[in-house]
Regions:
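Macromolecular interaction modules
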Residues: 1-258
Length: 258
Protein backbone atom coordinates (compact mmCIF):
# COMPACT_ATOMS: atom_id res chain seq x y z
CA UNK A 1 0.00 0.00 0.00
CA UNK A 2 1.34 3.38 -1.01
CA UNK A 3 1.50 6.25 1.46
CA UNK A 4 -1.30 8.79 1.25
CA UNK A 5 1.08 11.73 0.82
CA UNK A 6 3.34 12.12 -2.19
CA UNK A 7 5.95 14.80 -2.77
CA UNK A 8 6.43 15.19 -6.52
CA UNK A 9 9.38 17.05 -8.01
CA UNK A 10 10.04 17.66 -11.71
CA UNK A 11 13.38 19.05 -12.80
CA UNK A 12 15.76 19.53 -15.69
CA UNK A 13 19.49 20.20 -15.91
CA UNK A 14 20.21 23.90 -16.39
CA UNK A 15 23.04 22.77 -18.67
CA UNK A 16 22.35 19.53 -20.54
CA UNK A 17 26.08 19.10 -21.19
CA UNK A 18 26.40 18.47 -17.43
CA UNK A 19 23.59 15.92 -17.19
CA UNK A 20 25.87 13.26 -15.66
CA UNK A 21 26.89 15.68 -12.89
CA UNK A 22 23.21 16.56 -12.37
CA UNK A 23 22.32 12.89 -11.87
CA UNK A 24 25.35 12.10 -9.73
CA UNK A 25 24.45 14.83 -7.22
CA UNK A 26 20.72 14.12 -7.33
CA UNK A 27 20.94 10.34 -6.85
CA UNK A 28 24.11 10.13 -4.80
CA UNK A 29 23.62 12.94 -2.30
CA UNK A 30 20.33 14.80 -2.54
CA UNK A 31 17.80 11.96 -2.48
CA UNK A 32 19.59 10.02 0.30
CA UNK A 33 19.62 13.29 2.25
CA UNK A 34 15.90 13.90 1.74
CA UNK A 35 15.13 10.30 2.76
CA UNK A 36 16.26 11.21 6.29
CA UNK A 37 13.48 13.82 6.60
CA UNK A 38 10.55 13.01 8.91
CA UNK A 39 8.14 10.40 7.53
CA UNK A 40 10.01 9.61 4.32
CA UNK A 41 9.66 5.94 3.41
CA UNK A 42 10.89 5.73 -0.20
CA UNK A 43 12.03 7.82 -3.15
CA UNK A 44 12.41 7.01 -6.83
CA UNK A 45 13.76 8.92 -9.81
CA UNK A 46 12.53 8.52 -13.39
CA UNK A 47 13.63 9.93 -16.72
CA UNK A 48 11.21 10.87 -19.48
CA UNK A 49 11.10 8.31 -22.30
CA UNK A 50 8.32 9.67 -24.50
CA UNK A 51 5.44 12.09 -24.33
CA UNK A 52 2.09 11.67 -26.06
CA UNK A 53 0.51 14.90 -24.81
CA UNK A 54 2.04 18.12 -23.49
CA UNK A 55 5.54 19.36 -22.76
CA UNK A 56 6.93 17.48 -19.77
CA UNK A 57 10.22 18.12 -17.90
CA UNK A 58 12.74 15.29 -18.36
CA UNK A 59 13.19 14.21 -14.74
CA UNK A 60 10.63 13.13 -12.15
CA UNK A 61 11.32 12.37 -8.49
CA UNK A 62 8.66 10.77 -6.30
CA UNK A 63 8.93 10.87 -2.51
CA UNK A 64 6.54 8.79 -0.41
CA UNK A 65 5.76 10.24 3.03
CA UNK A 66 4.09 8.43 5.92
CA UNK A 67 2.10 11.44 7.10
CA UNK A 68 -1.50 11.96 6.01
CA UNK A 69 -1.26 15.70 6.70
CA UNK A 70 0.51 17.15 3.67
CA UNK A 71 0.95 20.53 5.35
CA UNK A 72 2.61 18.98 8.37
CA UNK A 73 4.76 16.82 6.09
CA UNK A 74 5.93 19.91 4.24
CA UNK A 75 6.66 21.75 7.48
CA UNK A 76 8.79 18.83 8.63
CA UNK A 77 10.57 18.71 5.29
CA UNK A 78 11.36 22.44 5.28
CA UNK A 79 12.64 22.33 8.86
CA UNK A 80 14.87 19.40 7.98
CA UNK A 81 16.26 20.97 4.80
CA UNK A 82 16.93 24.29 6.55
CA UNK A 83 18.97 22.59 9.29
CA UNK A 84 22.68 21.93 8.63
CA UNK A 85 23.85 18.40 7.86
CA UNK A 86 27.52 17.43 7.41
CA UNK A 87 26.70 14.97 4.63
CA UNK A 88 24.69 17.47 2.59
CA UNK A 89 26.24 18.86 -0.57
CA UNK A 90 24.95 22.12 -1.96
CA UNK A 91 23.45 22.03 -5.41
CA UNK A 92 26.14 22.33 -8.10
CA UNK A 93 26.46 25.84 -9.45
CA UNK A 94 24.87 26.74 -12.75
CA UNK A 95 26.79 27.17 -15.94
CA UNK A 96 26.92 30.93 -16.27
CA UNK A 97 23.94 32.73 -14.76
CA UNK A 98 21.34 30.41 -13.23
CA UNK A 99 17.66 31.27 -12.94
CA UNK A 100 16.50 32.24 -9.45
CA UNK A 101 13.50 30.30 -8.18
CA UNK A 102 11.06 30.88 -5.38
CA UNK A 103 9.88 28.51 -2.66
CA UNK A 104 6.44 29.44 -1.35
CA UNK A 105 5.44 29.42 2.30
CA UNK A 106 7.29 29.47 5.62
CA UNK A 107 10.97 28.65 5.43
CA UNK A 108 11.03 29.34 1.72
CA UNK A 109 12.08 32.44 -0.14
CA UNK A 110 14.04 33.11 -3.29
CA UNK A 111 16.91 30.74 -3.99
CA UNK A 112 19.80 31.19 -6.41
CA UNK A 113 19.55 29.09 -9.52
CA UNK A 114 21.96 26.18 -9.82
CA UNK A 115 22.49 23.21 -12.11
CA UNK A 116 19.15 21.73 -11.03
CA UNK A 117 16.24 23.73 -12.45
CA UNK A 118 13.00 23.03 -10.57
CA UNK A 119 9.84 22.90 -12.69
CA UNK A 120 7.50 21.47 -10.04
CA UNK A 121 7.75 20.88 -6.30
CA UNK A 122 4.35 19.89 -4.99
CA UNK A 123 2.54 17.74 -2.47
CA UNK A 124 -0.33 15.45 -3.44
CA UNK A 125 -2.88 13.39 -1.53
CA UNK A 126 -3.83 9.94 -2.79
CA UNK A 127 -7.47 9.55 -3.82
CA UNK A 128 -7.38 5.98 -5.15
CA UNK A 129 -4.94 3.09 -5.44
CA UNK A 130 -5.49 0.05 -7.67
CA UNK A 131 -3.54 -3.09 -8.52
CA UNK A 132 -0.13 -4.00 -7.13
CA UNK A 133 2.28 -1.17 -6.38
CA UNK A 134 5.78 -1.36 -4.92
CA UNK A 135 8.14 1.57 -4.47
CA UNK A 136 10.87 -0.29 -2.60
CA UNK A 137 14.34 0.03 -4.15
CA UNK A 138 14.50 -3.71 -4.91
CA UNK A 139 11.17 -3.86 -6.73
CA UNK A 140 10.65 -0.37 -8.11
CA UNK A 141 8.65 -0.12 -11.31
CA UNK A 142 10.92 -0.24 -14.36
CA UNK A 143 8.75 2.37 -16.02
CA UNK A 144 5.82 4.67 -15.38
CA UNK A 145 2.87 6.12 -17.21
CA UNK A 146 2.05 9.50 -15.68
CA UNK A 147 -0.95 11.67 -16.52
CA UNK A 148 -1.18 15.34 -15.53
CA UNK A 149 -4.82 16.43 -15.59
CA UNK A 150 -7.57 18.69 -14.26
CA UNK A 151 -11.35 18.78 -14.70
CA UNK A 152 -12.47 21.12 -17.46
CA UNK A 153 -14.00 24.40 -16.28
CA UNK A 154 -17.60 23.27 -16.84
CA UNK A 155 -17.14 19.58 -16.03
CA UNK A 156 -19.33 17.60 -13.64
CA UNK A 157 -16.43 16.87 -11.30
CA UNK A 158 -18.15 14.12 -9.32
CA UNK A 159 -19.16 12.28 -12.48
CA UNK A 160 -15.70 12.75 -13.96
CA UNK A 161 -13.97 11.38 -10.86
CA UNK A 162 -16.29 8.37 -10.82
CA UNK A 163 -15.43 7.68 -14.45
CA UNK A 164 -11.70 8.10 -13.80
CA UNK A 165 -11.78 5.57 -10.97
CA UNK A 166 -13.36 3.08 -13.39
CA UNK A 167 -10.90 4.10 -16.09
CA UNK A 168 -7.98 3.22 -13.81
CA UNK A 169 -9.17 -0.37 -13.56
CA UNK A 170 -9.13 -0.54 -17.35
CA UNK A 171 -5.61 0.87 -17.51
CA UNK A 172 -4.13 -1.70 -15.13
CA UNK A 173 -5.74 -4.54 -17.11
CA UNK A 174 -3.17 -3.76 -19.81
CA UNK A 175 -0.24 -6.21 -20.06
CA UNK A 176 2.84 -4.71 -18.44
CA UNK A 177 0.97 -2.35 -16.08
CA UNK A 178 0.83 -3.72 -12.55
CA UNK A 179 -0.84 -0.95 -10.57
CA UNK A 180 -1.54 2.72 -10.22
CA UNK A 181 -2.66 5.57 -8.01
CA UNK A 182 -4.38 8.89 -8.51
CA UNK A 183 -3.48 11.97 -6.49
CA UNK A 184 -5.04 15.38 -5.89
CA UNK A 185 -2.97 18.50 -5.31
CA UNK A 186 -2.49 19.54 -1.68
CA UNK A 187 0.06 22.35 -2.00
CA UNK A 188 2.70 23.75 -4.33
CA UNK A 189 6.13 24.78 -3.06
CA UNK A 190 7.62 25.85 -6.37
CA UNK A 191 6.83 25.92 -10.06
CA UNK A 192 3.56 24.75 -11.56
CA UNK A 193 1.49 21.64 -10.81
CA UNK A 194 -1.72 20.15 -12.15
CA UNK A 195 -4.75 19.46 -9.98
CA UNK A 196 -4.51 15.70 -10.48
CA UNK A 197 -1.72 13.25 -11.25
CA UNK A 198 -2.16 9.60 -12.21
CA UNK A 199 0.88 7.36 -11.74
CA UNK A 200 0.82 3.85 -13.21
CA UNK A 201 3.60 1.35 -12.53
CA UNK A 202 5.08 -0.66 -15.40
CA UNK A 203 6.67 -4.09 -15.09
CA UNK A 204 8.94 -3.35 -18.04
CA UNK A 205 10.94 -0.50 -19.48
CA UNK A 206 9.60 -1.30 -22.96
CA UNK A 207 7.32 1.71 -22.85
CA UNK A 208 6.63 1.61 -26.58
CA UNK A 209 5.06 -1.85 -26.26
CA UNK A 210 3.05 -0.87 -23.20
CA UNK A 211 1.79 2.23 -25.00
CA UNK A 212 0.64 0.11 -27.93
CA UNK A 213 -1.04 -2.43 -25.66
CA UNK A 214 -2.74 0.35 -23.69
CA UNK A 215 -4.16 1.79 -26.88
CA UNK A 216 -5.64 -1.60 -27.73
CA UNK A 217 -7.05 -1.96 -24.21
CA UNK A 218 -8.71 1.45 -24.15
CA UNK A 219 -10.23 0.95 -27.61
CA UNK A 220 -12.64 -1.58 -26.09
CA UNK A 221 -12.49 -0.60 -22.41
CA UNK A 222 -15.71 -0.89 -20.38
CA UNK A 223 -15.26 2.63 -19.01
CA UNK A 224 -15.44 4.06 -22.51
CA UNK A 225 -14.04 7.39 -23.60
CA UNK A 226 -13.56 10.56 -21.58
CA UNK A 227 -16.91 12.09 -20.55
CA UNK A 228 -17.97 15.32 -22.19
CA UNK A 229 -19.46 18.54 -20.87
CA UNK A 230 -22.89 19.87 -21.82
CA UNK A 231 -21.23 21.73 -24.67
CA UNK A 232 -19.75 18.50 -25.99
CA UNK A 233 -16.15 19.30 -25.05
CA UNK A 234 -13.90 16.95 -23.11
CA UNK A 235 -14.59 17.05 -19.38
CA UNK A 236 -10.91 16.36 -18.69
CA UNK A 237 -8.05 18.72 -19.51
CA UNK A 238 -4.87 16.71 -20.12
CA UNK A 239 -1.67 18.71 -19.66
CA UNK A 240 0.69 15.76 -19.88
CA UNK A 241 0.57 12.08 -20.84
CA UNK A 242 4.07 10.70 -20.53
CA UNK A 243 6.08 7.51 -20.16
CA UNK A 244 9.20 7.30 -18.02
CA UNK A 245 11.99 4.82 -17.40
CA UNK A 246 13.56 4.21 -14.00
CA UNK A 247 16.63 6.37 -13.46
CA UNK A 248 17.52 5.33 -9.92
CA UNK A 249 16.11 3.90 -6.70
CA UNK A 250 18.25 5.52 -3.98
CA UNK A 251 18.35 4.52 -0.33
CA UNK A 252 19.38 6.48 2.76
CA UNK A 253 22.99 5.50 2.09
CA UNK A 254 24.88 8.32 0.41
CA UNK A 255 27.00 7.33 -2.56
CA UNK A 256 28.34 10.87 -2.96
CA UNK A 257 29.70 12.87 -0.04
CA UNK A 258 31.36 16.27 0.34
Amino acid sequence: MLTNTLMLVRTHPQDMAREDEFNEWYTGNHVPDVLHAPGLTAALRYKLAMTHIGEVPPYLALYYIDNDDATDANNGMMAYLNAPDPKRMVMPEATGQGDEWKIHGAGGGTRPGGLISVDTWAYYTKTLEVGENDVSPDNAAEGLLVTYTAPAADADVDALNKWYDWHMDDIISTPGIRGGARYKIASVNAGEATQFVGIFELETDDVEKVAGDLGATLATAPSGGIPTTESGASALDIFGFAYYKLESAPTKEHTLLP
